[in-house]
Swiss-Prot record:
InterPro entries membership: C2H2-ZF_Transcription_Reg (IPR050717), Znf_C2H2_sf (IPR036236), Znf_C2H2_type (IPR013087)
Encoding gene, per UniProt annotation: ZNF16
Organism of derivation: Pan troglodytes (Chimpanzee)
Biased composition (Basic and acidic residues): 1-10
Compartments (UniProt record): Nucleus
Record protein name field: Zinc finger protein 16
Amino acid sequence: MPSLRTRREEAEMELSAPGPSPWTPAAQARVSDAPAVTHPGSAACGTPCCSDTELEAICPHYQQPDCDTRTEDKEFLHKEDIHEDLESQAEISENYAGDVFQVPKLGDLCDDVSERDWGVPEGRRLPQSLSQEGDFTPAAMGLLRGPLGEKDLDCNGFDSRFSLSPNLMACQEIPXXERPHPYDMGGQSFQHSVDLTGHEGVPTAESPLICNECGKTFRGNPDLIQRQIVHTGEASFMCDDCGKTFSQNSVLKNRHRSHMSEKAYQCSECGKAFRGHSDFSRHQSHHSSERPYTCTECGKAFSQNSSLKKHQKSHMSEKPYECNECGKAFRRSSNLIQHQRIHSGEKPYVCSECGKAFRRSSNLIKHHRTHTGEKPFECGECGKAFSQSAHLRKHQRVHTGEKPYECNDCGKPFSRVSNLIKHHRVHTGEKPYKCSDCGKXFSQSSSLIQHRRIHTGEKPHVCNVCGKAFSYSSVLRKHQIIHTGEKPYRCSVCGKAFSHSSALIQHQGVHTGDKPYACHECGKTFGRSSNLILHQRVHTGEKPYECTECGKTFSQSSTLIQHQRIHNGLKPHECNQCGKAFNRSSNLIHHQKVHTGEKPYTCVECGKGFSQSSHLIQHQIIHTGERPYKCSECGKAFSQRSVLIQHQRIHTGVKPYDCAACGKAFSQRSKLIKHQLIHTRE
């Protein structure tokens, strides 16, 4: 491919050759009407390129005898040649107010010179939408600056050399009326507000630039362009390491940091290391109770400046933008525009994939990532990627330990505002989620969803081993341990292992004697909250579990299940030694001790062993002389409940034990057994 210098030489030859002039008619007319002037290099080219006025306007060094500034390899000055610094454009005089040039399209600069031919890196090339426009804004041209330095570009149709800068111009005209930013101090005009800002040295607030998409205002044209790229979804900044593209240069810089393996910032307290200084500073604030950021309005202190800024917004009363529908006021006009779409129902941003519409362009961009699978926000610590920046910020708190949301009642901090809202209901007792079937209320929506499965019978969580279904995922996880036999939770005192953490916690109460759950009626304490709930039904008399066969009610669901086996004759618990079956697992456990001879329950008074704890309790009454079971009819007391029940049959006359041979009834089972011996002798 011919070099750019070869093309420039060819262009100079073509410019001197006969044929149609490459100058625009308006430019030719302006030059022909103005008095010709000579300049350094005019003898070499033989062309009076501009008038005295124009030359002075374009080059501030003109008529300065001590200045011999020239650009690289430039023998003479054309009106297209300008210096790259912003001061040259800022010093255009009012005598040249009618001649402001428009930046050409890339294709107009040179038909056969592409961005690649110019040496523009792929990561800095312009988006397609910008490269097809007629004007290059300063921000757009800024994409082309940097590695190119001071390279001159030649156009085949002109003897013009262009430097890649915001001041690149072509021989095209823009009327003076289209320059919206006059400068009162010197009468100078600029095509872009950012040029005026650079001239004044102070950002202008009187003439802000407004985004047509969202109504947000900007002080500079580059900020506006960057905002518009967010709406279009174009990604113009490419990462050299992984090839991923981004719409903002700041995001690209963050991406570069994620590729860096070095974690330069290490905490002296805990040794944790961070790549970014902001994450490091945020983390350090959690080691100390220092809160250096104080609100001047109410005196409340914060450990982070960002938390203070969020808090200060609550004191801001000025909201000049008011909705004429509902009267709600906003601090920003863009927020009002977005709010008004709630009343109008307008959803101007439509997904081209599924047709779903959104009120905000940002929501459309987020939604579109569900189709593309794009996750542009990556954690610099662990590399995990997210589709939304908010999700990344929440995730980063896992690494930093930051908990910026603090409960005003108890001071407990949380990493997420949603968790703070849920926690606050503990103090208020609020239960906003109500079941439409039974009226029961819940503090969390997830609890309501799980509760409703009682009414619907839905069991969405299925075991992939045996196919058994469950209403709750937690119950499924517990069930799956049956198949694996895993017992990952081990007691540090006795070494006993458990399949569930809750079972380990309950077991540890045996060693500590801790019984934190107390009944407010009688003061009895329990090691498990579930046992307290069951106990409280003794006081309330509540029996919520009813048998559908006989109507009998029970205080515990397990008792109902055991009772129902009487009706269906089911005895699922079978002894593997003798084959005897039982309707309760507890009865099987007791029975198996007959085969093993195990008597784990020993009396501390006499050393006698028992296979069941209930037998030990009954035995201990012998030593204490306690008789807690008293007859309500005659006042007689007994050491065992079973003996009291037998005694009460004297008063009631109940004889539940019938002889199958003769039909005679007895109040005690032992008497029936003795009676049956009469029939066996016969």
